[in-house]
A protein has these predicted regions:
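Intrinsically disordered, low-complexity segments enriched in small/flexible residues
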Residues: 1-63, 67, 211-300, 304-307
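A structural preference for long, well-packed, hydrophobic secondary-structure segments
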Residues: 136, 305-332, 350, 360-368, ...
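Glycine-rich phosphate- or other oxyanion-binding loops that anchor nucleotides, phosphorylated ligands
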Residues: 69, 75, 83-86, 121-127, ...
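Conserved catalytic cores of soluble enzyme domains
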Residues: 110-227, 339-445
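A structural preference for short, pocket-lining loop segments at secondary-structure junctions
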Residues: 61, 65-74, 89-114, 292-306, ...
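Structured core elements
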Residues: 69-71, 144, 251, 291, ...
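Glycine-rich anion/phosphate-binding loops
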Residues: 50-54, 80-92, 274-286, 310-323
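General structural feature for long, well-ordered alpha-helical segments within catalytic domains
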Residues: 7-10, 42, 86-89, 93, ...
Length: 445
């Protein structure tokens, strides 16, 4: 069942002080570009029923103290379908957002392209995708809220093309609408919950929490910190002396009670909002990515490994985070803590190598400053991909190595009891890393 909320009710749910855009439009020409029998009458009935003249309502409103352009779909108007006028209005809204340097919030509820207008309607997808790309290139954030339903071209342009994608619980979300799917298709695959599980949306938000969630996101994405992020202070025991050996450094980094990414994020940021998924079918709970507010009210983006072997989806999500922060001019903080990249057959099938390469490239080409802190295990390339060149720091409870000591001993055909000596030879302690010029410094507790 479709969301009964109208376009204007959806706007009122999330925004204050809404000012609608006016559009200069002539009367609908007959039965449209195809001369579709009865189209003009259907259009008139939809207008009379909803009080709207098209399937979108556009304007500006205030959300959490941030002015934004809103594009809200009216599903009661011909199923919220995308016609030429729909495209023209949404395109104009994007153009006005760029002219005024405002973020864009889209409240979708659409079945897709309007068949009464044929290819002229389908071409609106190119128009909207282009406008979204230009807004993205202008460094302005775009947030989509997927209402029920969000299918077809609306999902594939304004929905999935947004920087942050939120959805209402139970919303029907998918490229294929309910009437064009295979007859044996599992309907659960076309839901917001399924899209979240497969990395295509960032969060499911209840209607009562939507205003606050949007306000938090807009506040974070529009107030970047100035200059590089400072590395957080270490959270371990300040009275613990430096590791006396490589083996001890590894043991401390692997200790189950050592502070992990969650503790660092909680201590460093007063407010956070997280993205989820790599937009390619994967989610890695061991890589937390998002945006956090510093005590001065400014925003830093973060990508944090949580001590597990990082999956390909985790590397791709981190790359997505770095590129989004770069477009918005927000400095990045990365927290490194992994025994290494996942190396099981499924990880290889999911593209471990290409995913790591993608993250290396995102960090290397970022125009915003990137700061990295090694908080635990630094396991080879799976850790290095998240490290900022020339701006890497370490905590006393960490190590960084070309390979785990046990694996190195195995490759060198040494007996297991020689792994401790191998750890010393690898010079992986924080102090060793400082001497080698790998890290800039060791942060204190």
């Amino acid at each position: 069942m479709s969301d009964p909320t109208t376009a204007r009710e959806a706007i009122a749910l999330v925004a204050d002080d809404f000012t609608e855009f006016s559009f200069t439009e002539g009367p609908l020409a007959g039965d449209g570009p195809l001369g579709w029998p009865g189209y003009s009458a259907a259009h008139a009935r939809a207008s009379a029923r909803t009080g709207e003249t098209e399937s979108v309502v556009c304007g500006t409103g205030e959300i959490g103290g941030v002015r934004a352009v809103l594009i809200s779909f009216e599903f009661g108007f011909l199923g919220g379908s995308l016609g030429e006028r729909t495209g023209a209005r949404a395109a104009a809204a994007h153009a006005r957002a760029r002219a005024r340097r405002l973020p864009v919030v889209v409240l979708t509820a659409t079945g897709g392209s309007r068949m009464h207008e044929g290819m002229r309607a389908l071409l609106q997808l190119q128009l909207l995708a282009g406008e979204s790309a230009r807004t993205r290139a202008a460094g302005l954030p775009q947030i989509a809220v997927l209402r029920d339903p969000t299918t077809g071209g609306g999902w594939a342009t304004l929905g999935a093309g947004s920087d942050v994608v939120l959805a209402l619980p139970g919303a029907q979300v998918g490229f294929a609408g309910s009437r064009v799917r295979p007859p044996d298709a599992d309907p659960a695959a076309y839901t917001a919950e399924a899209q979240l599980a497969h990395g295509h949306i960032d969060a499911i938000v209840t209607p009562d929490a939507l205003r606050g969630t949007l306000g938090r996101w807009l506040s974070l994405l529009t107030r970047p910190a100035e200059g590089p992020a400072s590395p957080p202070r270490a959270l371990g025991d300040p009275d613990t002396p430096p590791a006396a050996s490589g083996r001890e450094a590894v043991a401390r980094a692997r200790h189950p009670e050592r502070p992990r990414a969650a503790a660092y994020l909680d201590a460093h940021f007063s407010v956070r909002a997280e993205i989820s998924g790599d937009r390619a079918g994967g989610v890695d709970p061991g890589m937390r990515c998002g945006f956090g507010r510093l005590p001065d009210g400014r925003t830093v983006a973060y990508a944090a490994q949580c001590g597990t072997s990082t999956r390909p989806a985790g590397f791709r999500t981190a790359a997505r985070l770095v590129r989004l922060a770069d477009r918005l001019g927000i400095p990045v903080l990365t927290l490194i803590d992994t025994p290494g990249a996942a190396n099981d057959p499924e990880a290889e099938r999911a593209g471990a190598g290409p995913a790591i390469a993608d993250l290396f490239a995102a960090v290397a080409t970022a125009r915003v400053p990137v700061t990295s802190l090694l908080i635990g295990e630094g396991g080879s390339g799976g850790a290095l991909a998240l490290a900022a060149p020339d701006n890497l720091w370490a905590t006393p409870d960490s190590y960084f190595s070309v390979i785990a000591p046990e694996a190195a001993a195995s490759i060198l055909k040494r007996p297991p009891e020689e792994s401790a000596a191998t750890a010393d030879q690898l010079r992986l302690r924080p102090g060793d890393l400082l001497d080698l010029g790998v890290v800039r410094g060791i942060v204190e507790n």
